[in-house]
Amino acid sequence: MTTNTVPLHPYWPRHLKLDNFVPNDLPTSHILVGLFSISGGLIVITWLLSSRASVVPLGAGRRLALCWFAVCTFIHLVIEGWFSLYNGILLEDQAFLSQLWKEYSKGDSRYILSDSFVVCMETVTACLWGPLSLWVVIAFLRQQPFRFVLQLVVSMGQIYGDVLYFLTELHEGLQHGEIGHPVYFWFYFVFLNAVWLVIPSILVLDAIKHLTSAQSVLDSKVMKIKSKHN
């Protein structure tokens, strides 16, 4: 006589055997409030800092962009950095960030499975885009001449990683989450990651606009110098 056993975990595919899984002891609301509170605090601090610490006045749009990069610094360095270091013990670990990743994994179980792609992708993100996001903030506050180059590089890197993130899961048949679930699929998997396609795309166009304008000015000056010599 066979019996259907219900998996003792919330992850997909449902047949996954996760013997060392320890359920979160923090409510989902506490985890999400903690995450968004820290992010909100960083936005407020960066908004105020961009008004007082910048060597030249910055417009509202530029200050919002710096708030974005400040949040990216936190998420890439701290949250994704934690995953890069401790992905092998997430299932049984009860640290706040481990519980955050176990919660997010309800939308994409590749994270609690230490999938090769997500481990490598998140490690690159933590090591490169985290520090460089902080550098973008500093570069704009100090009006460093390469600031738009940094913005372009970081934003392109974020888009590239996000596109691969979606495409690899699509290639595997979206099997690591419950398709259509309003929270786990649409909010965790789709919305939270789509943000890293939309905002970086806007910032890529912004950087291209400023770099193109600067190149046009330089070309114009060079042409004037050449015309004088001729």
From Swiss-Prot:
Documented EC number(s): 5.3.3.5, 3.3.2.11
Subcellular location: Endoplasmic reticulum membrane; Nucleus envelope; Cytoplasmic vesicle
Reactions it catalyzes: lathosterol = 5alpha-cholest-8-en-3beta-ol; zymosterol = 5alpha-cholesta-7,24-dien-3beta-ol; 5,6alpha-epoxy-5alpha-cholestan-3beta-ol + H2O = 5alpha-cholestane-3beta,5,6beta-triol; 5,6beta-epoxy-5beta-cholestan-3beta-ol + H2O = 5alpha-cholestane-3beta,5,6beta-triol
UniProt superkingdom: Eukaryota
GO cellular component annotations of the record: cytoplasmic vesicle; endoplasmic reticulum; endoplasmic reticulum membrane; intracellular membrane-bounded organelle; nuclear envelope; nuclear membrane
Keyword check for Transcription: no
Residues modified as N-acetylthreonine: T2
Similarity section: Belongs to the EBP family.
Name recorded for this polypeptide: 3-beta-hydroxysteroid-Delta(8),Delta(7)-isomerase
Biological source species: Mus musculus
Source organism phylogeny: Eukaryota, Metazoa, Chordata, Craniata, Vertebrata
